[in-house]
Amino acid sequence: PGFAIEEELLHIQPFLQEKTCIGSVVSCTGFFFTAYRILGKTASLFGFQRAPFIARVQTYGQKALLLGYKKELQIATVNISKSDILLRTLQEMLDTPVRMLHHFLEASLTNSNPLLHPARLYSLFHTWSRGKAYHEIPGFYNSWDEESSELLIACDNEFQQILKALPVRIEPIPTLLEYYDSYDARSLTRKIRSIIAFKHIPAPMEKTEKGFLPDFKSRYFTEDFPFGLLIIKSIADVLNICTPNIDKILLWGQDVLNKEYIHE
């Protein structure tokens, strides 16, 4: 998870040898940026663009459910001279084809979880007020609605403008409509609702005496806001690109989390 990357890099740093390869299954939570800052720009790094599968713990330390396997994976490398050997090793380990990206930003920037989760959370809970409880836990994906799709598409349009201003190829990071074989909010809603691997994933909520409340300790909040959407927003600011929909979600998120990410 994004919040643990810095701590783990600092922990292993004294034991690293020259040209030791350090990698992350999840790159979109700031792995490359954090590794550069801590290990220096000569560090040998690799990172996946998307996780190989969805994992859910069933029995802690013993059993997990692995769902939604990808047909193909993509990684970016930095300062790794024999990247072909790394590629073959990862393919053998995961039994999945792995392709090489051209730039580490192509792995660092994704319109997957950093956009998908916050947009859905906003649609689910933006009318929530402190003290309000819900009678049931909605499905995060199987009750996905057009409001969520419309906001997600709007955020992705802003994200695509950022990509166009960076030295990356557009092809490895398709629009969400392209990725989900959809053409508008309605078809995207149908598609997301139909994904079998997503079927039984609940919205992040916790049970209380009054009912169910949003679980602000969930990684959907603790990771995808500060280590996902905020990274995208920070790059947009450097490029002077306006992101009104991303801003709206971040402002709401920082309010319910009692944080300060951006200014109005």
Name these PLM-found stretches:
Residues G2-G61:
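Rossmann-like NAD(P)(H) cofactor-binding subdomain of soluble oxidoreductases
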Residues E7, T89, E150-Q161, A165, ...:
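A non-catalytic, amphipathic alpha-helix used as a structural packing/dimerization or gating element
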Residues T29, F33, D84, I153, ...:
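A structural signal for well-ordered alpha-helical segments within the folded catalytic domains
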Residues P52, Q58-C155:
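Substrate/ligand-engaging "lid" and interaction regions
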Residues A185-E264:
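C-terminal helical cap and adjacent loop that interface with cofactors, partners, or active-site loops
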